[in-house]
A protein has these predicted regions:
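C-terminal binding/interaction regions
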Residues: 60-69, 73-99
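Conserved mixed alpha/beta catalytic, RNA-binding, or beta-rich assembly cores of soluble enzyme
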Residues: 1-63, 78
């Protein structure tokens, strides 16, 4: 449901352990300076059971790894506490791209 890229290279793809564990892989990041986080809906995903969600705690983790941009797909991601999320992104100069 999510991945992390640097430029045009995919560095990490979320697995069964979840988004937080994937982000934690970059907790000591010093090598990559153009990280992009992408949140998406899996093919044939059942919305009633598992819907892509992002909230302030995830964004705080992304801030720690110095993410430059976050890409979400319109009507495919639930944003928890949207106002706080947008403030966190703005205050940390993270670009939000909605496709």
């Amino acid at each position: 449901q999510s991945l992390i890229m640097n430029g045009d290279r995919i560095l990490a793809l979320e697995n069964f352990k979840g988004t937080s564990k994937m982000i934690d892989l970059f907790s000591n990041n010093k090598s990559f300076n153009e990280l992009i986080f992408v949140k998406f809906k899996k093919l044939n995903q059942i919305n009633e059971v598992d819907f892509p969600v992002i909230g302030p705690e995830t964004i705080k983790k992304l801030i720690k790894i110095k993410i430059k941009a976050m890409i979400l797909f319109k009507k495919q991601t639930l944003i928890v506490d949207k106002i706080n999320c947008l403030k966190l992104l703005k205050n940390n100069n993270i670009n939000l791209i909605v496709l």
